């Protein structure tokens, strides 16, 4: 199938300055992400950035395109919408948003989310999830949960523990870490969109829920659009947010 990968890459990061240009065994992090995207068979890979230093760091890569975008975007999705405009992408083009801090993302996951959207015409967006397997993630606000309807359309995404098991999630069980979390799904932050929807997304007002939870996908649900969620065929390793994360990736690639 045909799809395009867009990788938003902001230079400034609160916890890791110049994060896209961090060295990982002789390659920048953003270059490693583009390599994984190319392995997916995408017909085009575009890095969307707001900083000339990232443009310069990628000049030697002939297989990808780099798009300079505005520094004023509120989210990575808004940045994707600008890419659609600059490249004049056809309305039915499928765009996969790959995070710029995931140098180990499996190419199969990129293919899966693109296929997911292609096969679900009622959805404006497709994304992935995975069963929560660690009790530490049940009440971890950084592990975003998703609840779906019977057709695997998202009902809600939250940093809170949803669905809440009224009978099992007692204070005692929480303290003993003996809660039953088999019904919980963790959201995996990869998305597929049609270019037509990205253009529409850029015109949508920011939703109160999005501001409250700091989850941009809630803008989609707030405005009445559907997000299809499928369980990932392979669980992507966590992205890089801290120096410890960076070392973990380096250790993984060294073995």
UniProtKB/Swiss-Prot annotation:
Its main location: cytoplasm. It is an enzyme of class 2 (transferase). It is found in: Cytoplasm. Keywords: Cytoplasm, Lipopolysaccharide biosynthesis, Nucleotidyltransferase, Transferase. One of its GO terms (molecular function) is 3-deoxy-manno-octulosonate cytidylyltransferase activity. GO terms for biological process: CMP-keto-3-deoxy-D-manno-octulosonic acid biosynthetic process; lipopolysaccharide biosynthetic process. It catalyses: 3-deoxy-alpha-D-manno-oct-2-ulosonate + CTP = CMP-3-deoxy-beta-D-manno-octulosonate + diphosphate. Pathway: Nucleotide-sugar biosynthesis; CMP-3-deoxy-D-manno-octulosonate biosynthesis; CMP-3-deoxy-D-manno-octulosonate from 3-deoxy-D-manno-octulosonate and CTP: step 1/1; Bacterial outer membrane biogenesis; lipopolysaccharide biosynthesis. Its EC number is 2.7.7.38. GO terms for cellular component: cytosol. It holds the Pfam family CTP_transf_3. Belongs to the KdsB family. Activates KDO (a required 8-carbon sugar) for incorporation into bacterial lipopolysaccharide in Gram-negative bacteria. This is 3-deoxy-manno-octulosonate cytidylyltransferase. The lineage of its organism: Bacteria, Pseudomonadati, Pseudomonadota, Gammaproteobacteria, Alteromonadales.
